[in-house]
């Protein structure tokens, strides 16, 4: 008796699931792939809780020096407690694949673990991944080469996030 009830319940359940009236459909075209914050340049700003990425929706960067100029010229969004600790001047950046080199006139003023260095590293890593779509921002390593003093790096953006 128990077996009959179990079989009947299973058959009834299967019939209910397959008989819901939804007809199969073919492939539905949905247009272009999704886009949003994962594309485009982001500038990184400092806050008491760490670095925060700010997307630049209406700006285009043609090279890494353009990203540096944007970082120096763009005010952080108001009301979020974000600031820029980077004072630009005497920096130039070049990139190839996953490597970015920042050349500085004179000694580099950052310690390598400060938020100003993080702003530069993360902004340049993101810009390099936009300029070379085969490169992931997480894989970019930035090295600072001052005209005076020792090189600093290579540094990755992840070292500065989540602090």
Residue ranges and their predicted role:
Residues 2-163:
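Bimodal "functional hotspot" detector
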């Amino acid at each position: 008796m128990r077996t009959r009830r179990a079989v009947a319940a299973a058959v009834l359940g299967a019939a209910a699931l397959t008989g819901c009236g939804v007809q199969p459909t073919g492939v539905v075209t949905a247009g272009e792939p999704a886009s949003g914050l994962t594309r485009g340049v982001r500038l990184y700003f400092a806050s008491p809780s760490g670095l925060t990425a700010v997307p630049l929706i209406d700006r285009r960067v043609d090279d890494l020096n353009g990203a540096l100029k944007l970082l120096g010229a763009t005010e952080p969004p108001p009301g979020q407690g974000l600031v820029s600790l980077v004072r630009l001047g005497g920096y130039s950046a070049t990139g190839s694949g996953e490597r970015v080199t920042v050349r500085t006139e004179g000694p580099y003023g950052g310690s390598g673990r400060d938020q100003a260095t993080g702003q530069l590293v993360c902004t340049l890593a993101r810009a390099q991944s936009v300029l070379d779509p085969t490169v992931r921002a997480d894989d970019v390593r930035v090295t600072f080469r001052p005209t005076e003093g020792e090189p600093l790096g290579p540094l990755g953006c992840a070292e500065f996030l989540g602090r």
